Curated annotation (Swiss-Prot):
Propeptide: 22-43
Family recorded in the similarity comment: Belongs to the conotoxin A superfamily.
Record's protein name: Alpha-conotoxin-like PuSG1.2
Sequence segments annotated as region (Lacks the Ser-Xaa-Pro motif that is crucial for potent interaction with nAChR): 48-50
Keywords for this protein: Acetylcholine receptor inhibiting toxin, Disulfide bond, Ion channel impairing toxin, Neurotoxin, Postsynaptic neurotoxin, Secreted, Signal, Toxin
Endpoints of the signal sequence: 1-21
Entry's free-text remark on domains: The cysteine framework is I (CC-C-C). Alpha4/7 pattern.
Disulfide bonding pattern of the chain: C46-C52, C47-C60
Protein task: Alpha-conopeptides-like may act on postsynaptic membranes, they bind to the nicotinic acetylcholine receptors (nAChR) and thus inhibit them. Has possibly a distinct nAChR binding mode from other alpha-conotoxins, due to a different three residue motif (lacks the Ser-Xaa-Pro motif).
GO cellular component: a single term: host cell postsynaptic membrane
Length: 63
């Protein structure tokens, strides 16, 4: 029974760590802080368009 409890706790910690890492990565991409090619492509495609820039101010820097 003790081994099962240890396994459950280990899986919960692993899941929490993986979820936190993914969440932080998404937040960085959404705020324009991630320098990866996907976020740059989205920003470059959206920011020149006034409607997209207005709907997504979190990815377009202020002018």
């Amino acid at each position: 029974m003790r081994c099962l409890a240890l396994l459950v706790v280990t899986l919960l910690l692993f899941t929490a760590t993986a979820t936190t890492g993914a969440s932080n990565g998404m937040n960085a991409a959404a705020s324009g802080e991630a320098p990866d090619s996907i976020s740059l492509a989205v920003r470059d495609d959206c920011c020149p368009d006034p409607a997209c820039r207005q709907n997504h101010p979190e990815i377009c820097p202020s002018r």
